[in-house]
Amino acid sequence: MRIVLITGISGSGKSVALNALEDAGYYCVDNLPPHVLPELARYLAHEGQNRLAVAIDARSSASLDEMPGLIRALSREHDVRVLFLNASTQALIQRFSETRRRHPLSGSPSHDADVGLLVSLEEAIERERELVAPLAEFGHQIDTSNLRANVLRTWVKRFIEQKNDDLVLMFESFGFKRGVPLDADFMFDVRALPNPYYDHELRPLTGLDQPVVAFLDALPVVHQMLDDIETFLVKWLPHFREDNRSYLTVAIGCTGGQHRSVFLAETLAARLSRQASVIVRHRDAPVAVDASSRLVT
């Protein structure tokens, strides 16, 4: 059975991800107590269901300590994938304010208070980060701070299409002016490269458009940086495999996330596609949804 566990921070998009999996034919359960999961998997397998998606968050805090061992045990019998959704505190506060929802932990007494004061939203978010942090190491992390819901749904569908027998390498382009991604294992700053933005004909385009591709591809310094990053990754990918890593996110950042970082992410994804299963995602570039997150084959 394929089991997808969705966890992370409240407000980071777990409901959106779960809905995307339901549309893909998964049997979906929100906030299932972890200890019930093995029994549910056995029951569904007996009933002929082969795809299960479960969202787990801090509302199950009493059982979160069981999750690492539970994931290992389930992985011996099933194809288990863990998706850990994260977002910046600022983005989460804005989302809770817009929806007027209450954070699951906001009604708990503050650890620092001698009386029964309720914690602030920011305190609740930070407490939840501590509770769910051990689960992050088991799956792929994705920063949804700057993701639209439709882009997240597209990315989740790409995520479940990946084979589970190899390390998945994700190249993510971004713009520093919108903040650094929280989900990056490695981050490369390419702002030292010539910027197509200063060419008025190239400014409205992206690193996916042929005129920008031609501009950057003609520069030796761009190829030097590409070669250096590729050499580093090719050297260290075997070590990550030996460490049983399932996912590795490489973030490529330029000023706005529109030209240079997009071109380099695309080029590196193509170069490394024979070394690993590859996903490329463009966080900040104004591109179509189907181009913002895709598999590289």
From Swiss-Prot:
Reported function: Displays ATPase and GTPase activities.
Annotated protein name in UniProt: Nucleotide-binding protein BPSL0529
Residues that, per the record, bind ATP: G8, I9, S10, G11, S12, G13, K14, S15
Alphabetical UniProt keywords: ATP-binding, GTP-binding, Nucleotide-binding
An example Gene Ontology molecular-function term: ATP binding
Residues that bind GTP: D57, A58, R59, S60
Family as reported in the entry's similarity comment: Belongs to the RapZ-like family.
InterPro entries given in the database record: P-loop_NTPase, RapZ-like, RapZ-like_N, RapZ_C
Gene3D superfamilies: P-loop containing nucleotide triphosphate hydrolases (3.40.50.300)
Residue ranges of coiled coil: none
Classification via PANTHER family: RNASE ADAPTER PROTEIN RAPZ
